[in-house]
A protein has these predicted regions:
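Bacterial N-terminal signal peptides that target proteins for export
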Residues: 1-11
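Bacterial N-terminal signal peptides
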Residues: 10-20
Length: 237
């Protein structure tokens, strides 16, 4: 027992020092960006020589590149719930496409909620907690969001599988004879319209507008921005 108690004390002491230093120094604005189903093997900063990802590569060069950051679960819902609440999936009991709030309970804060309760304006654009892709994006609905986390929320409705344009089902369709399939399938759609017709284009525009608007806030802001690609279906202009 002795071996476990001393590191625990040091950890608690470190947390206390960290919290006191937060109070002492200026509260900084926080921009949190998350994409959907983006594997590190598709990024130049992790060694991919084919995909062109200059903006992410620059962030990696100027910041911290994590090499041992792991998903907490094998799919979206539990991973997002774990990330946003800081609990392992076995604690959130979010085994499906939920926010995790149902099992965590109203007395536990997500970290956006913690910032909100400590003087921050907390906002999100599009998918941060779970949203169904394509259904919630096509409808512009909240999905399995956590309302207690935000002062402000914006959804980015956009065309999905049935967008006007040329589409093809690639999943289990080697000869190209299958019709365009809906749902969570490996589908490519060359959709009509430019970036601002699509969910991610709208999300980027809204996020930029909020950052400019928040210059006049009398408090710091936390802005969470969620992009739904490269989650299937691959719908792009």
């Amino acid at each position: 027992m002795r071996g476990n108690s001393r590191p625990s004390f040091h950890w608690v002491a470190a947390l206390l020092l960290f919290n006191s230093s937060l109070v002492a120094r200026e509260q900084l604005n926080v921009l949190f960006i998350i994409s959907d189903d983006l594997t590190l093997t598709a990024l130049g900063c992790y060694g991919n020589k084919v995909c062109k990802t200059p903006n992410i590569d620059r962030l990696a060069t100027e910041g911290t590149l994590f090499t041992r950051a792991y998903c907490q679960a094998t799919f979206c819902g539990p991973s997002r719930a774990s990330l946003m609440f800081g609990y392992y999936p076995y604690a959130t009991k979010a085994n499906g496409y939920t926010s995790g709030r149902e099992k965590v309970g109203p007395d536990k804060d997500s970290w956006p909620q913690y910032l909100r309760n400590n003087g921050y304006h907390s906002a999100r654009v599009s998918k941060v907690f779970h949203m169904g892709v394509p259904p919630d994006i096509a409808k512009g609905s909240d999905g399995a969001d956590d309302p207690a986390s935000w002062d402000e929320k914006l959804n980015s409705r956009g065309p999905e599988t049935w967008a006007p344009g040329k589409g093809e089902t690639l999943q289990n369709n080697p000869d190209g004879t299958k019709k365009l399939a809906g749902g969570n399938r490996f589908v490519v759609v060359e959709a009509e319209g430019g970036d601002l017709v699509h969910s991610d284009g709208k999300t980027a525009q809204k996020a930029a507008e909020l950052i400019h608007r928040y210059k006049t806030l009398d408090k710091p802001f936390f802005l969470a921005v969620g992009f739904v690609r490269p989650h299937v279906p691959f719908v792009a202009p």
